[in-house]
């Protein structure tokens, strides 16, 4: 299945999402949304991820009529606590100390706003982080890699050393579940060509 020349827009400033989307669509436009990503503590993490993804896509939709706009937001959860991107190095250290030696959930809310229909869905994967020493945590933070990642690590980069195992979609853990995205695009009548 390959896309035709229909307009596809990614509402994200994440280089990882751009990289992932290029694996299935060689051509698309990137138009980041600059909405404030605010969590509603009264909602489940899955609903927060969906709502933020939808807000990202819908915020730019008026600028792209007759297009399919993709929004996504990734959260990490453990024991009912939600971890987004760390605010600073101290916060990254706190997050990694909480995750180390434990299994957590990575939830990506994905939304597709099509010309006729909007669909969103949360996708969940599980990741088990091995026990980490204080030095391993500090050395990893010193690389700068954790600073723009939900959960303060990147499974596909240097942070892979700390991952003992995972289940579910790896592209979901990175930030954009590709198989599930294709299903949402089909449901919004994205015109794939054979």
Residue ranges of predicted features:
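Anionic-ligand binding patches
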Residues: 2-9, 44-194
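N-terminal beta1-alpha1 ligand-phosphate binding loop
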Residues: 3-26
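Cofactor-binding loop segments of dinucleotide-utilizing enzymes, especially the Rossmann-like FAD-
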Residues: 13, 33, 115
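Surface-exposed, flexible loop/turn segments at secondary-structure boundaries
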Residues: 16, 36-38, 118
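Generic domain-boundary/flexible-linker signal
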Residues: 19, 39-41, 121
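A short beta-strand-loop structural module common to alpha/beta enzyme folds
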Residues: 28-39
């Amino acid at each position: 299945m390959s896309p035709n020349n229909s307009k596809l827009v990614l509402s994200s400033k994440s280089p990882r999402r751009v990289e992932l989307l290029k694996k299935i669509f060689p051509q698309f436009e990137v138009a980041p949304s600059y909405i404030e990503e605010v969590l509603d503590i009264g909602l489940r993490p899955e609903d927060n991820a969906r709502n933020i993804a939808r807000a990202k896509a819908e915020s730019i939709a008026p600028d792209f009529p007759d297009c399919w706009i993709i929004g996504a937001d990734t959260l990490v959860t453990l024991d009912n606590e939600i971890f987004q991107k760390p605010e600073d190095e101290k916060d990254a250290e706190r997050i990694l100390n909480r995750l180390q030696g434990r299994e957590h959930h990575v939830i990506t809310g994905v939304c597709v706003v099509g010309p006729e229909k909007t669909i969103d869905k949360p996708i969940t994967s599980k990741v088990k982080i091995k026990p980490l020493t204080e030095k391993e945590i500090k050395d990893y933070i010193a690389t700068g890699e954790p600073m723009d990642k939900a959960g303060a690590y990147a499974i596909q980069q240097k942070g892979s050393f700390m991952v003992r195992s995972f289940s579910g979609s790896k592209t979901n853990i990175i930030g954009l579940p590709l198989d599930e995205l294709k299903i949402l695009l089909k449901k919004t009548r994205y015109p794939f060509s054979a």
